[in-house]
């Protein structure tokens, strides 16, 4: 049984047995976040079905020649870091997931390394106030400016990136 089916079944059973009330669900579920997640997944699925990530990967491989796995990993991590700081971590994941799937299917990177690189890159949101929800949460009340995030986040971004890439390098075959 897949996870979604089990989750829906457990929720329905909890509702039928009176363990879960609809009012509690409405109050405790972040519906805005759920909307963003579902939209991002829909976008990601449409992108994968279009074949664009496979074409982009083929173009990249033809343009760059034979690159090592660590080079592909660094490119993935940097692209995800830029996307997560420019958009948000969820948007970065949704946009780059199809490309990572194409990289895995094309034999460029092993799946574990590729998806960890994507996840860690999407968490590297230290440069802007809108890259991650917590950054935005303290932005206004703390009286910070965007330049403060850039100034304080640049060192963290490089340190975090170095640690992640060194770690992931050991997972490469």
Language model segments and positions:
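Transmembrane helix interruption/hinge and helix-loop junction motifs
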Residues: 1-6, 86-88, 108-111, 173
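Pore- and pathway-forming membrane helices of multi-pass small-molecule/ion transporters and channels
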Residues: 7-17, 118, 122
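Alpha-helical transmembrane segments of multi-pass membrane proteins
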Residues: 69-82, 108-127, 171
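Juxtamembrane and boundary regions of transmembrane helices in multi-pass small-molecule transporters
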Residues: 112, 119-173
